[in-house]
Amino acid sequence: MRVVIQRVKSSQVTVNGKIVGQIGRGLNLLVAIATTDTENELDWMCRKCLELRLFPADGQSDRPEKSIQDIDGELLVISQFTLYGDCRKGRRPSFSDSAPPQVAQHLYEKFVEKLRQSGLRVETGVFGAMMEVSIQNDGPVTLLLEREASGSIMDNG
């Protein structure tokens, strides 16, 4: 599982000209599910997204001291299978490491459900749709989180 996590002042996602998800201060999460992922990876990734200290303390330095939960921030979660694009061969990315849509959608929805259990406001895009994402980055702060399925070749514990 891969998540690109971005600290934002605001973010919104539009499908067919209609805003389907919009947040203020918080985190924009671009989420990709691998062929080897199971529900086991979701708990770790959810906890990491909610607990990473990416926000400065109010009135303090820019040093990140607070998590999204500490600031009662908002989350915009967008599915993005292209995070598993393999560009090592040829001129067209291979997406063979991305989970099939039906598997990915199930795990994506479970991930969103787990994030919502935090009590924070969680908005989403539309799984599988062509989306326009507008982001006002804050910092910018952008990180790539990765958690491979237990027992897979790339397991990073």
UniProtKB/Swiss-Prot annotation:
<keyword id="KW-0820">tRNA-binding</keyword>
<keyword id="KW-0963">Cytoplasm</keyword>
<dbReference type="Pfam" id="PF02580">
    <property type="entry name" value="Tyr_Deacylase"/>
</dbReference>
<comment type="subunit">
    <text>Homodimer.</text>
</comment>
<dbReference type="GO" id="GO:0043908">
    <property type="term" value="F:Ser(Gly)-tRNA(Ala) hydrolase activity"/>
</dbReference>
<comment type="similarity">
    <text>Belongs to the DTD family.</text>
</comment>
<keyword id="KW-0694">RNA-binding</keyword>
<dbReference type="GO" id="GO:0051500">
    <property type="term" value="F:D-tyrosyl-tRNA(Tyr) deacylase activity"/>
</dbReference>
<dbReference type="GO" id="GO:0000049">
    <property type="term" value="F:tRNA binding"/>
</dbReference>
<keyword id="KW-0378">Hydrolase</keyword>
<dbReference type="InterPro" id="IPR003732">
    <property type="entry name" value="Daa-tRNA_deacyls_DTD"/>
</dbReference>
<dbReference type="GO" id="GO:0106026">
    <property type="term" value="F:Gly-tRNA(Ala) deacylase activity"/>
</dbReference>
<feature type="short sequence motif" description="Gly-cisPro motif, important for rejection of L-amino acids">
    <location>
        <begin position="139"/>
        <end position="140"/>
    </location>
</feature>
<dbReference type="GO" id="GO:0005737">
    <property type="term" value="C:cytoplasm"/>
</dbReference>
<dbReference type="GO" id="GO:0019478">
    <property type="term" value="P:D-amino acid catabolic process"/>
</dbReference>
<dbReference type="InterPro" id="IPR023509">
    <property type="entry name" value="DTD-like_sf"/>
</dbReference>
<protein>
    <recommendedName>
        <fullName>D-aminoacyl-tRNA deacylase</fullName>
        <ecNumber>3.1.1.96</ecNumber>
    </recommendedName>
</protein>
<comment type="function">
    <text>An aminoacyl-tRNA editing enzyme that deacylates mischarged D-aminoacyl-tRNAs. Also deacylates mischarged glycyl-tRNA(Ala), protecting cells against glycine mischarging by AlaRS. Acts via tRNA-based rather than protein-based catalysis; rejects L-amino acids rather than detecting D-amino acids in the active site. By recycling D-aminoacyl-tRNA to D-amino acids and free tRNA molecules, this enzyme counteracts the toxicity associated with the formation of D-aminoacyl-tRNA entities in vivo and helps enforce protein L-homochirality.</text>
</comment>
